[in-house]
Amino acid sequence: MKELIFLLMLGLFGGMLSGFIGSGGAFVLPPGMMAIGAPGAIAVASNMCHKFPKAMIGAWRRLQVGHLDFRIAGLMATAAIFGVQAGIYIQSIVAKKLGPAGTNLYVTMAFLIVLPTVSYFCIRDVIQSRKHGIDDTEPLLARKLEKKFKLPPMVHFKTAGVTQSLWLTLPTGFATGFLAATIAVGGFVGVPSIIYLLGAPSVVASGTELGIAFVMGSTGTFSWAWFLGAVDFRMTVLILAGSLIGVQVGAVGTTYIKQYMIKLAMAVVMLQVTLDRKSTRL
């Protein structure tokens, strides 16, 4: 019974994060499932399975308030499909050669490396925004890429209000899909990438990522279940039940807060999960 309640509350919290910052809560859910004994590969696969219906609802809500760029979502989702398949292949190799302990170590070490890095950039950008009294700014890296990286074709993203090279957008999508399949995280890399590489506003980046997550989740779930049988549908249903409520609460919340708060919330949660995984590892 304790595990049931834990999974429901975990899903609720993950759903709120998904609707609020566009991440899908992937950096919270797999560690939570692993904390109650789920092997790393099953935690990754089950998270991906629950992701796409939740992401579909969140994307629809964000579309209604104009926070989803269809062109970014379409291009990145196409590349993400290939990234997902590559990620599943790598994860399957780790599982075959090192077993459940190897997948647990792989997932944990990836969290400990990537999460603090992304958190640093988010916090730095928030400090710069507040220092200059601006709610949300186009990051310096994105401005430089927009001016100097002009490898055609150049694509204009109307909702995001930026123009970037197709050859910058596609690798960003591939990397998002790869991480989503290997360590269950895509959104916490996808959202910062859309912000810091493509230059989209925070609310558009988080809303667009939900559309990408829907495509990644639906295609990735099929591959995980069909080829590796790694999806635990009981855990998936429990987490999804909580997430479907949480994602709507989180999506509504974005209309009432300043954009820099999305980055700050993302950074704080990432650091908390990093500390939790580090203590678990130790």
What do these predicted ranges mean?
Residues K54-V65, V215-V231:
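Membrane-interface helix-cap regions at the ends of transmembrane helices
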Residues L10-G22, G173-A184:
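Transmembrane alpha-helix interface/packing and boundary motifs in multi-pass membrane proteins
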Residues P39-F52, L210, G229-S243:
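Structural signature of hydrophobic alpha-helical transmembrane segments
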Residues I21, A26-A73:
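Juxtamembrane transmembrane-helix termini in multi-pass membrane transport proteins
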Residues I21-L29, T182-S193:
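Transmembrane helix boundary and interhelical junction motifs in multipass membrane proteins
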Residues L29-I42, G190-V204, S223:
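Interfacial segments of multi-pass membrane proteins
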